Amino acid sequence: MKLAFLYAGQGSQHAGMGQDLYEAFPAFRAAFDEAAAAVDFDLKEVCFTDAAGVLNETQYTQPCMTAFAAGLTAVLREAGVTPDYAAGLSLGEYSALACAGVFDVQTAVALTAFRGKAMAAAAAGRTCGMTAVLGLDEAPLQACCNTAADEGVVQICNYNCPGQLVIGGDKAAVDKAAELALAAGARRCLPLNVSGPFHTSLMHSAGDALREKCKAVRFAPMQFPVLFNCLGHEMEETDTIAALLEKQVQSGVRWEVTVRRLAELGVDAAIEIGPGRALTGFVKKTVGSAISCYPVETAAQLQQLLRTMKGA
């Protein structure tokens, strides 16, 4: 068996995520608390109760999701479950890099907290959005975006799986492109629960900020390969992690290509780490049964997974 860890991105977060894991697994609790110490707000309160209603704001979402991922990774590692490859959707790429030993948990959380603030700042003062477009291929959707560009910036920003693309940018342009997409044959258009036009050119200033921030980060060698969003595969010898993270925030996420590459590499099992089952769905729609995917969000799911892995 070749195993990949797949780390979820923004959009699946919800109040209460991780609370049962925190109570059930000491390793989760230790890693989560270590992560929480890297930010200047009560990360546990935001994750578990979100009384202030800020969890969906990207500067909070990102470190909270990263802390959740760190906790789950720690439990899996303690149980002897380690991956041959890792990848993460957008934000999840930082957790994949932490899992591969490129930087520690606190650095991952500090970076994603910084990234969240930089992305929020890049979107400040603009009315923006992102919408999933179902049932329309890339070429006709790109034509819709080109036509809608007179309303503002709109670009394809996520290539999730066959039949599911995401567009983002100025809300008026996104809405116009979605309307055109439906007329062109798209099955549905669904606005996403995110707070900015992520992975579009509107994030250019966030990319600049990340480039400067990464100058102070020591990137250790990977313990196993990570597949990068903006490439859809492992990094080349001429690539640097800092440059890829800078590019990632302002360019499309090549997730479908990433999943196909994992299958080419012989991966036949994957664990989705994070709330929700979005990545599991993308894997199934992309490579069918070639990769068995196990989503893990709750203590019960994790306990079942550990039993499954023990018997594998």
Can you describe what each PLM-predicted range is?
Residues 174, 213, 218, 266, ...:
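NAD(P)-dependent dehydrogenase/reductase Rossmann-like domain
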Residues 227, 246, 259-263, 280, ...:
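Generic hydrophobic alpha-helical scaffold/packing signal
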Residues 250-267:
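A short, acidic, amphipathic alpha-helical segment used as a generic capping/interface helix at domain edges
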Residues 10-12, 37-39, 100-251:
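Alpha/beta catalytic cores of group-transfer enzymes, especially the acyltransferase/condensing modules
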Residues 1-141, 146, 192, 269-287, ...:
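FabD-like malonyl-/acyl-CoA
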Residues 77, 182, 263-266:
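Non-catalytic positions within long, well-ordered alpha-helices that form the structural scaffold/packing
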